[in-house]
Amino acid sequence: DSCSNIIQPLTPCLNYVRALGQFSDIDIQTIPEQCGISATLPPID
């Protein structure tokens, strides 16, 4: 899966965000920055 190398590093952060119950309120494009990860996510349709 070509996306696994992008998603895997984000997993701990996504879990943290979900734990806060705010996933739907956060712009997916800001997650790498918020998590201190230098990455560019493709647009999610």
Curated annotation (Swiss-Prot):
It comes from the Eukaryota. Expressed in pollen. Belongs to the plant LTP family. Keywords: Allergen, Lipid-binding, Transport. This is Non-specific lipid-transfer protein. Plant non-specific lipid-transfer proteins transfer phospholipids as well as galactolipids across membranes. May play a role in wax or cutin deposition in the cell walls of expanding epidermal cells and certain secretory tissues. Disulfide bonds: none annotated.
